[in-house]
């Protein structure tokens, strides 16, 4: 009889504990779902990033045109990179012309930047510094190594490919659309203050307080276009 009483008491205690847990809203945690390789791939969605100049102080724009690239259109095959493995790419820098910049301009910087490059920091394809204010255009192909088409004292930085030249666009297959920003920046100083070994990021940091205007062509390009 005593043994039966103990069993009944134990069952009653367990029942009370369950009821108490339910009455306070406590529930057992569900086991965590296992993440599969398919789930990870599904989460890896390529998103077009914001304008890289959006976070800089606002400055006026001016007119920038080109005979070889068009704003809002993909880079032509000649402006893509055979060096980086694009079939048919020729790494020829585009022709550029600009006008309407402020009278206080004393030099220009020309660049091409891909903010969507899979690096975590974008990719500088071309950077030319210390272009004198009397220059208002660059011919196609001015971005070759040791270019004679650049006006003195302009020079090319190494860029992210490690070479002082134009490196064409090279969007990796399956990485979506890359917005190539071809930009002419007007400065109120005759020299940028950097050397050819500087990164595009360092140049940008250095010239930011001296930027008086900026003009940009955006060429959205994906692999195979």
PLM feature spans:
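Sec-dependent N-terminal signal peptides
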Residues: 7-13
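N-terminus-centered regions that define maturation/targeting leaders and the start
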Residues: 2-7, 22-225
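C-terminal motif of bacterial Sec signal peptides marking the signal peptidase cleavage site
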Residues: 17-21
